[in-house]
Structures are given as C-alpha cells and as structure tokens.
Amino acid sequence: MYKQIVHAIGKAIQTLLLGLIKSYRYLISPVLMSSCRFYPSCSCYAETALKRFGVIKGSGLTVWRLLRCHPFHPGGVDFVPEKSNEMV
C-alpha cells in the first residue's frame, strides 16, 4: 500500500516538474533567446531525465547539468545516460 502511495506522489511531482519545464520553454526561454551551451538544451535534458529516471535521479542529473551550464564551461553534446537494467 505504501509503495502505491509513494509511486502516486512521485508521479504527481514528476508531472508538476514537467509542467514547470514546459512553462519555462514557452514563457521564459523565448525571451532569453538561445543561451544553453549544450545539446540537447538543458530543458530538453531535464525532461528526458525525469521521464527516463523518475523524480529523484532525474532531478539529480538535471541539477548536475544546470551547474555545468555557465559561461566558463565549453558545453557540447551531453545526452541523458541510458537506463541500465542492472539491479544495484
């Protein structure tokens, strides 16, 4: 039962975060122009990471990516890692 509750809460948070990303793309990003140093853009990376890994790991990957997106980092191609089927 707790597993179902935790899963439902995780899905709700994931939906909220994806909505925030979509809002950023349509409301803020057009004003800032293209300023991301990476491909895919940080918002696209965040969306993919959240969908692929869920809230906790996806958010961690997104934060790490955002910390590297600054004028002193060269940027480049940085895809979200593939999901491993291994049990850790």
From Swiss-Prot:
Instruction: Please give the superkingdom of this protein's source.
Output: Bacteria
Q: Which Pfam families match?
A: YidD
Q: Which UniProt keywords apply?
A: Cell inner membrane, Cell membrane, Membrane
Q: Where in the cell is it found?
A: Cell inner membrane
- Is DNA-binding one of the keywords UniProt gives this record? no
Its placement in the membrane is given as: Peripheral membrane protein
GO cellular component entries: plasma membrane
Q: What does this protein do?
A: Could be involved in insertion of integral membrane proteins into the membrane.
Q: Give the protein family.
A: Belongs to the UPF0161 family.
Tell me the protein's name.
Putative membrane protein insertion efficiency factor
